[in-house]
């Protein structure tokens, strides 16, 4: 049987392959498609007009990087079952499914005391019932309950695919070039030791650049005074509406 897939053209990474089957079903699911209407960087477009990209685009980009990371780790002798690869790809596709309007801006405003990660998990469990348990392994990885801890670290950790994508993507769409990290090199430097994600010594300089890029993106984009002021006004309006 020929390999069937859906090809999506992404402005940041080029062509992204989505295999037909579980992963394609996730991409088409209404709960993930909902992210096409949620901006990745909240109200940052008031400062950077190009920042119109969405959580859906970010999820696809993180999925693409996850696919590359799995291939790279396997090439270094780290055995990963096909079922584990599919599960960790599913987990990264769904990691932001719990985001509400304006992404992080209204977190803990509309629903008090509940993080978007908790909502993501709730929605994943709901989807798992719809899909007859096909997401069970992905949920284990997402909750860090799977023995191969490095799989969870690829989804949520200091060198996760979420972070590698959002820095490059947010840099691309805002035009703040300081965030344009060398994600391809970082992925090539990844390895596993004692079921933990590690970096080769020759990749340390790339990690230093990543940390610097992240700090600069927070300074210039995520915590820009104008964006923060708009966010505070929105939160205030929502708060008054709840009274």
Where are these regions (language model features)?
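Sequence-structural signature of the catalytic-core scaffold of metal-dependent phosphohydrolases
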Residues: 1-39, 46-90, 98-240
């Amino acid at each position: 049987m020929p390999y069937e897939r859906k090809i999506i053209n992404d402005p940041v990474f080029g062509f992204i392959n989505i295999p037909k089957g579980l992963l394609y079903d996730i991409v088409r699911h209404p709960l993930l498609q909902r992210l096409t209407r949620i901006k990745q960087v909240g109200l940052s477009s008031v400062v950077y007009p190009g920042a119109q990209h969405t959580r859906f685009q970010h999820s696809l980009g993180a999925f693409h990087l996850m696919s590359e990371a799995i291939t790279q780790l396997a090439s270094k002798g780290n055995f990963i079952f096909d079922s584990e690869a599919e599960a960790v790809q599913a987990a990264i596709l769904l990691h932001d499914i719990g985001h509400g309007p304006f992404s992080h801006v209204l977190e803990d405003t509309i629903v008090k005391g509940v993080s978007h990660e908790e909502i993501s998990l709730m929605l994943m469990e709901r989807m798992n019932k719809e899909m007859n348990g096909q997401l069970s392994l992905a949920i284990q990885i997402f909750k860090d309950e799977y023995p191969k801890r490095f799989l969870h670290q690829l989804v949520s950790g200091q060198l996760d695919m979420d972070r590698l994508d959002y820095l490059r993507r947010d840099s691309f769409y805002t035009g703040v070039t300081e965030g344009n990290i060398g994600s391809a090199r970082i992925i090539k430097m990844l390895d596993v030791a004692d079921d933990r994600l590690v970096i080769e010594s020759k990749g340390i300089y790339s990690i230093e650049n990543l940390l610097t890029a992240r700090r600069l993106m927070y300074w210039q984009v995520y915590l820009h005074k104008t964006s923060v002021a708009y966010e505070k006004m929105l939160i205030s309006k929502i708060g008054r509406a709840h009274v």
